[in-house]
Design a protein with these regions (language model features):
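Helix N-cap at the start of a conserved alpha-helix in ABC-type nucleotide-binding domains
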Residues: 61-62
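Hydrophobic anchor residue at the start of the ABC signature
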Residues: 39
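A short, surface-exposed alpha-helical micro-motif characterized by mixed small hydrophobic
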Residues: 91-93
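Helical segment within the ABC ATPase nucleotide-binding domain
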Residues: 65-77
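H-loop/switch region of ABC-family ATPase nucleotide-binding domains
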Residues: 85-86
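Conserved ABC ATPase "signature" region
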Residues: 4-21
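Catalytic Walker B motif of ABC-type/P-loop ATPase nucleotide-binding domains
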Residues: 50-53
Length: 135
């Protein structure tokens, strides 16, 4: 493992909304704080590809905004982020390319604009073909 300098580590912790000066056992962290710590761990080694599985789960609104801002900054720095999400808003906001999976296999790959146009059409078609919809 590469040595990570303390200033860099503090910056990452601040970017994900954790106080680097606070000394607290991780087992006492809330779910959201553990999620933020996991994101910090994923990005701290400055790898070319960052893999994040549902990174917004367990975060409050401020935490979600902080993480989204950080991911956009990392993307602008040229880092590749593999984001697993079921949240269409996150996908639309953060992704350039979409890989749709089913049964553990990639079914199709699309650019976000193509996906957005076709996804919206398929939702409308799906609901317009139903006789009874209960909400």
């Amino acid at each position: 493992h590469n040595k990570v300098n303390k200033k860099y580590l503090k910056g990452i912790m601040l970017n994900v909304g954790l106080d680097p000066e606070k000394r607290k056992a991780v087992k006492k962290y809330s779910i959201g704080m553990k999620q933020r710590l996991g994101i910090a761990q994923a990005i701290m080694e400055n790898q070319e590809i960052i893999i994040l599985d549902e990174p917004m789960n367990g975060l409050d609104i401020d935490g979600i905004q902080q993480v989204k801002k950080l991911l956009v900054e990392l993307k602008e720095q040229g880092r590749t982020i593999l984001l697993v999400s079921h949240n269409y808003e996150d996908i639309e906001e953060l992704c350039d390319v979409i890989y749709e999976m089913s049964m553990g296999k990639i079914q199709q790959k699309n650019k976000i604009l193509f996906w957005r146009n076709n996804y919206c059409k398929s939702i409308i078609t799906c609901f317009s073909n139903r006789k009874n919809i209960f909400i």
